[in-house]
Amino acid sequence: MGLFDRFGERASSSAAPAAPSAPEPGSVEAIAAGNVTLLQFLRRESGQIPNRAYILARTIAQHLDDVVADPSAHLLDVGSRITLERMATTHLPDTINAYLAARTMPDADELLVEQLATLEVAASKAAA
């Protein structure tokens, strides 16, 4: 056994096991993982947003669940899957966070509901 073999062996035997990797972006698994995080976020912020907005956000999450549960979800084009993933991980949380930062502004509640209604239409079309 050469000098480099011993060091390589020692290094590999003491290395920690690899952490499970995150789902591949745009995969059905990534949509599911994003939706889990979204639901946790919604539970945490539920008392801070108007009831109508909360209902719309939960409806969007349900549409995402419907997509994930559909066995043909893997057949969606990658662009659609990435859009759905981003809806759960970015679009919806960012919309709610923007509302939370500006909720004292006039018409903030109505604007939030309007934005979430637009996202809900897109999510319902994807789930159909």
Task: For each feature predicted by the language model, list its residue ranges.
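Membrane-proximal, non-transmembrane interface segments of integral membrane proteins
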Residues: 14-75, 86
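Cytosol-/stroma-facing membrane-proximal "stalk/adaptor" domains immediately downstream
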Residues: 78-128
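Polybasic, Ser/Thr-rich amphipathic helices
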Residues: 1-12
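A generic structural micro-environment signature
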Residues: 7, 55, 90-93
